[in-house]
């Protein structure tokens, strides 16, 4: 009986964690209880335990619940056992070693593009970029890759973030929105995204997609460097290098 109860507790906790993976801005207890089909009191007991294990966090201002830092740590641990993830991390390490620039691997989470691996630059830059950092989906090279190659759910997220960003730009909102999606089409055609001096002034980035076996976007691999050293023009050497890497990734074939 005790064993059965224990397993049931894991299942219920799993429902809570699943619900939190599907929210963008966190959930208040009442919504989380409805989403998981539990009375609020029972749901509160579970999230209290999950908070103690750092699987769940609670915003001190809003009271909303989100996935906690240990959830990310579990995800990173899983990545070590995934062959495509290993290939991607090894690629990032090689790019950092060959170019001297910082190289990042990001995945899509409920918060947007999120870094899961950082290969530091040969001469580290004073940037607040680390594992768990989330990029803007509309103002970064990594975000543009997810907007261009991601699923319909990702595109809906990007659309909401874009419209939130543009809500005070009437009457030019539609023009800005069209300009953004035109840029996304360019990214799709080029097979990569590049940004100059944004979102971080003085920093450039080039990002490429890593597609999984089903043809869906799994990761983005991003090279980050200063505007004076990492040139991102169409014929610049590091952009051409990333184009070569794109061809190499195609040759990976069906990585299990």
What spans do the regions from the language model cover?
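Conserved segment of winged-helix/HTH DNA-binding domains
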Residues: 70-98, 127
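Short hydrophobic alpha-helical segments used for membrane anchoring or interfacial signaling
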Residues: 105-110, 118-119
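Short, solvent-exposed recognition segments
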Residues: 125-199
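Short, acidic, Ser/Thr-enriched surface-loop or helix-capping motifs
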Residues: 60, 108, 211-213
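N-terminal helix-turn-helix
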Residues: 1-81, 247, 251-255
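Extended hydrophobic
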Residues: 172-247
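Amphipathic alpha-helical regulatory segments at dimerization interfaces
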Residues: 19, 46, 87-98, 186, ...
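Short glycine-/small-residue motifs
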Residues: 55, 115, 219-220
């Amino acid at each position: 009986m005790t064993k059965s109860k224990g397993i049931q507790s894991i299942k219920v906790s799993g429902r809570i964690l699943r619900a939190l993976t599907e929210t963008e801005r966190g959930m208040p207890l009442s919504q989380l209880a409805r989403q998981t089909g539990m009375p609020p009191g029972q749901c509160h007991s579970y999230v209290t335990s999950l908070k103690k294990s750092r699987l769940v966090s609670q915003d001190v201002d809003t009271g909303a619940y989100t996935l906690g830092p240990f959830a990310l740590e579990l995800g990173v641990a899983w990545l070590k056992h995934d062959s495509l993830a290993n290939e991607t991390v090894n690629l990032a390490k090689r790019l950092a070693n060959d170019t001297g620039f910082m190289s990042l691997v990001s995945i899509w989470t409920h918060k947007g593009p999120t870094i899961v691996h950082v290969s530091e630059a040969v001469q580290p830059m004073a940037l607040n970029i680390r594992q768990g950092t989330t990029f803007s989906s509309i103002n970064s090279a990594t975000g543009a890759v997810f907007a261009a190659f991601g699923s319909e759910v990702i595109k809906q997220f990007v659309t909401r973030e874009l419209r939130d960003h543009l809500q005070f730009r009437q009457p030019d909102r539609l023009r800005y929105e069209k300009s953004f999606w035109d840029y996304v089409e360019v990214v799709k055609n080029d097979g990569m995204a590049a940004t100059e001096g944004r979102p971080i002034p003085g920093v450039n980035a080039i990002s490429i997609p890593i597609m999984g076996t089903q043809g869906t976007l799994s990761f983005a691999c991003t090279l980050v460097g200063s505007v004076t050293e990492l040139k991102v023009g169409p014929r610049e050497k590091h952009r051409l290098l990333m184009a070569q890497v794109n061809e190499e990734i195609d040759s990976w074939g069906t990585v299990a």
